[in-house]
């Protein structure tokens, strides 16, 4: 999976880049059909924000997290995306198991 990292008012150091890659590549354990991700790291006066847009088959997923520490924001972002990816995977697998109401109706 390709991960693009952009920084607003923050320099993306190699350590920060490696941390983002390590945390967000774990999402592939939950779902194999991840095509790409765009991560934006932003620093304002008192908060560090991490946002990510994840391209999956049949849609896109978005999550953001705010914290006083950038690494904590990345951790929270990873947790939010993991929940969204598992929910998306369950939607796709459960959708194919549905049967029509018409076939189950009693004549």
Q: Language-model segments: which ranges?
A:
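N-terminal, polar/charged subdomain of small-to-medium soluble alpha/beta proteins
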Residues: 1-107
């Amino acid at each position: 999976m390709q991960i693009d990292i952009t920084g607003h008012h923050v320099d993306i150091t190699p350590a920060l880049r490696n941390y983002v890659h390590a945390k967000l590549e774990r999402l592939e354990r939950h779902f194999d059909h991840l095509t790409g991700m765009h991560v934006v790291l932003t620093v304002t006066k008192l908060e560090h924000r991490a946002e990510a847009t994840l391209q999956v088959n049949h849609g896109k997923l978005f999550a953001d997290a705010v914290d006083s520490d950038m690494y904590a924001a990345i951790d929270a972002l990873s947790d939010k995306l993991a929940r969204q990816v598992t929910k998306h995977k369950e939607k796709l697998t459960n959708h194919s198991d549905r049967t029509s109401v018409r076939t189950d109706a009693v004549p």
